[in-house]
Swiss-Prot record:
The lineage of its organism: Bacteria, Pseudomonadati, Pseudomonadota, Gammaproteobacteria, Pseudomonadales. Its EC number is 2.1.1.163, 2.1.1.201. It comes from the Bacteria. This is Ubiquinone/menaquinone biosynthesis C-methyltransferase UbiE. GO terms for biological process: aerobic respiration; menaquinone biosynthetic process; methylation. The gene is ubiE. Residues 1-21 are annotated as: Disordered. Transmembrane segments: none annotated. S-adenosyl-L-methionine binds at T79, D100, D128, A129.
Length: 256
């Protein structure tokens, strides 16, 4: 009887890479990963993508439709790549909020943008994507780049993003996805599980964080599943664009 009650009240589990962990532990484990890699995050992005991440982000910005005077929220904004570009687009009459749940990443982003002198219209907020601390109908555009796969309850996060958008506002999700052909998929698997942890070891002295990165990509919903999640959350006109043979996809949805 006691064993049955324990089972009934057992904490739900989720994935951390390929591991099955209690939900309460995932956020802590993800935080440890980003505390470890924050200082060399930009360098590793360039090394692992061959600089392609800059092109993926540029296309995302083009799709965003952000213009002067807009209010933009960049979730999991990390070291500030998107925030810096949005800052220039919205100008002095607009606002950019760079939000990240990880204080190490937020500090790196704040220091980097202040050093570049582009933080005048940027606010830095430590925030959980599942429980965004912003008013309803507040932002013209919300973006999250390479962050959604680390969120425990993705459906809750997407609904939270919908809530803070103004009617007609846009959500853009840039994330690793599923390659669209078998040859690319096999090559990408070999690259991910051999080179990525090795590069992590050599550059950051941390192979495990980059093994988690490779595993977390495989556990993330594919393009059509993520599209359906956005529709279920309440977004209209949801579309996605594959880049680099589907290794990365950017999804866009509009708040009705």
């Amino acid at each position: 009887m006691n064993d049955q009650r324990k089972g009934e009240h057992a904490e739900p589990t989720t994935h951390f890479g390929y591991q099955d962990v209690p939900e309460s532990q995932k956020a802590k484990k993800v935080a440890e990963v980003f505390h470890s890699v924050a200082a060399k995050y930009d360098l590793m992005n360039d090394v692992l993508s061959g600089g392609m991440h800059r092109l993926w982000k540029r296309f995302t910005i083009e799709l965003s439709g952000v213009r002067s005077g807009n209010r933009v929220l960049d979730i999991a904004g990390g070291t500030g790549d998107l925030a810096a570009k949005f800052s220039r687009l919205v100008g002095p009459t607009g606002q950019v909020v760079l939000a990240d749940i990880n204080d190490s990443m937020l500090k790196v982003g704040r220091d980097r943008l202040l050093d570049r002198g582009v933080a005048g219209n940027i606010e830095f907020v430590q925030a959980d994507a599942e429980k965004l601390p912003f008013p309803d109908n507040h932002f013209d555009c919300v973006t999250i780049a390479f962050g959604l796969r680390n969120v425990t309850h993705k459906d809750e996060a997407i609904r939270s993003m919908l809530r803070v958008l103004k009617p007609g506002g846009r959500l853009l999700i840039l994330e690793f996805s599923k390659p669209t052909n078998k040859l690319m998929s096999k090559a990408y698997d070999a690259y991910s599980f051999a080179f990525m942890p090795l590069a992590g070891k050599l550059i950051t002295n941390d192979s495990e964080s980059y093994r988690y990165l490779a595993e977390s990509i495989r556990m993330h919903p594919d393009q059509e599943t993520l599209k359906a999640m956005m529709v279920d959350a309440g977004f209209d006109r949801v579309t996605y664009h594959n880049m680099t043979s589907g290794i990365v996809a950017v999804h866009r949805g509009i708040k009705p």
